Amino acid sequence: MSQQETHGFQTEVKQLLQLMIHSLYSNKEIFLRELVSNAADAADKLRYLALTDDALYEGDGELRVRVSTDKEKGTVTISDNGIGMTRDSVIEHLGTIAKSGTKEFFNNLSGEANKDSQLIGQFGVGFYSAFIVAKKVTVRTRAAGHPANEGVLWESEGEGSFNVETITKNSRGTEIVLHLRDEEKEFADDWRLRSIITKYSDHISVPVEMFEAGKDAQEGEDGETIAAVEGQWKPMNKATALWTRNKSDISDEEYQEFYKHISHDYTDALKWSHNRVEGKQEYTSLLYIPAKAPWDMWNRDHKHGLKLFVQRVFIMDEAEQFLPNYLRFVRGLLDSNDLPLNVSREILQDNQVTTAMRVGVTKRVLGMLEKLAKDEPGQYQSFWAEFGQVLKEGPAEDFANKERIAGLLRFASTHEGSAATTVSLEDYISRMKEGQDKIYYIVADSHEAAANSPHLELLRKKGIEVLLMSERIDEWLINHLTEFKGKKLHSVTRGDLELGELEDAADKEAKDKITEEAKGLVERMKAALGAKVSEVKVTTRLTDTPACVVAGEGEMSTQMIKLMQAAGQAVPESKPTFEINPNHPLVARLNDEADEQLFADWASLLLQQAQLSEKGSLADPSAFIKLMNQMLLANAK
């Protein structure tokens, strides 16, 4: 018995339909790209499920997609004999957009038709592109393995609602009929559709067929009879798995179109690597580095990974087991000869073949990036701007490749004099002073705060380069990256500066002399500040600033404390080391102050000033302002 129901579209779908109908007029042909791609995916899914239940084929194992037109009726039909849909899945998939992607989709819309059209497939809303050219869309579908009387009819004119009805459908799979708008009748032309299929779908491994009309029997030039030719369905695409072909036979354009098909990113990839591994493990990898970061790169709940095929049979999307998380931006596929066809995500978790492939694929990607950095530094900088922060997760996650990952990192530096992150650790080492055995760095809230930090004063005076780090992830990175090519990374804001051989005999003599002369001042400061500091000492790093605060060698840095507090984590109490510069006029004036209360106020003011410079904030700014005003008034008299 037919059950007809009318459903209202989800609000977000209404917005999307308006976008399709009114905004994407400049790239209308994408509707066929999207619908053919969806149909091919449905065939892949059936092939996978039929591995364990070949009854799903229902006697028809030749999977294909068919495209046909009817000029008189003004329709285009895209059909497949893939997995099909049940009534519930029709309502779910053709009436709503997954909540997880809805907000991001609309936030990413730019208002530029070409850019927005590229987002459609990326956000899994390709079906709705049918309404770019259609005034009405009719879908007939039946899920494989279900009886013929459980077919479903879905129909909508792209307004506020859609109808769903139970029908009889003898063949499994899905048929989508587009009733073209009057102004879109060009798409009812066979040759127009053939050219679109060749352009976008040549790489799809499922045959995409169109009907070639037959010919009546006719008389030849010599009077012989030429037999009639029956009409037949013929593939319009190569229908072979691109990655199985010889690299030399594949054009750059074919590689790029295949990337767009598997990634739903309709901008060209930055680089790719196509490789066949033979030996103990046999597999083919086709790996792409995107040019732009995907919208969900920072969404930890969203799966990332490669498409997995076993002996050319599609097994699963987003197989995360073959790449470490810091390479989650990589797109592509693996085709293994060693994994079983019934492989599951659970089996992949603990599998020697998986582990070996993961090691190989990771090395392949790192090699690709190293080559890009060496041969095309400009292109690598484009990559770094998009994915650098993700790559910085690598040293903590992948100990075996820590040195290689570190070589790919880029930083701002006092040598460059700009915020551009273009300096590699190799660059830094190549410019190190004679006798320098450490890589000096500073982590701050912003590039400006790092570049203008008083902790750099002595190093600048001596011409020693300092790496300037200001990304949120940098403090975390540096806790896991402590050395590169035998050179220790040393924070200029923690512990002693440790210049080693960069400090000559005259420097040491001057430091010892000023430390001895300031002993009394240091003791008075300790008494005045009491529990506010862990230690007061003469600075080894300041030349122009009166004082600074420094974290102890084994203590948390200011930036790490901020990160933990922002994450709502408890932070162990710590007190800074207070370093003073006796050569600064303010400190020299303080040394002559006989009034102990006034001395204590000045000492407190200098401490809070140093903390403000280091942290960018104070625990009690009102008390600081009150004390400052008090001191200003006293000096104004």
Swiss-Prot record:
One Pfam family cited in the UniProt record for this chain: HSP90
Single GO cellular component term: cytoplasm
Cell compartments where the protein resides:
Cytoplasm
Q: Name one GO molecular function term.
A: ATP hydrolysis activity
UniProt KW keywords: ATP-binding, Chaperone, Cytoplasm, Nucleotide-binding, Stress response
Q: What is its main location?
A: cytoplasm
Name the segments for region: C: 563-637
Q: What is the top-level taxon of the source organism?
A: Bacteria
In terms of NCBIfam families, this protein maps to: PRK05218.1 (NF003555)
Family (UniProt)? Belongs to the heat shock protein 90 family.
Q: How does it assemble?
A: Homodimer.
Recorded protein name is Chaperone protein HtpG
Biological classification of the source: Bacteria, Pseudomonadati, Pseudomonadota, Gammaproteobacteria, Alteromonadales
